Amino acid sequence: IPLENLRDQRLFRVLDYWRSKSAQGRLPLRRDIDPSEFRWALGLVCLLDVEQRPLRFRYRLDGSVIATRNGHDMTGHAIDAIEHKPSAGMLHGQFATVVAEKAPAAHRIATEYGVAGTTYERLSLPCPMTATTWP
């Protein structure tokens, strides 16, 4: 969905924070992001590391609210370890797009996995390690 169509105001706050760390048209780097500056959202935030060849995504941090909702903590695990393979494939595709386009992306997801009948929004924000290491 277009970023401006997000319904969750918390996501707008996180997006504003990310944009504030963007200097001179470059993506904010991982070192620019300080989780202590958005403590109010930490339980809802996942931080992922991007691995190359093959392209994989590994949870550096799985937010506690998300882990509780899903029934397991993915911290330290790759997305392909998610038991529900359609969800793993969806996540991989969405995150791969963020990496390829070097731009934020928003999604509204309706799911019957975990909590039946749940709809939620996801905001994915790229933060490479260095300006030269982004694929």
Show the residue positions of the predicted features.
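Intrinsically disordered, low-complexity terminal regulatory regions
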Residues: I1-I82, G89-P135
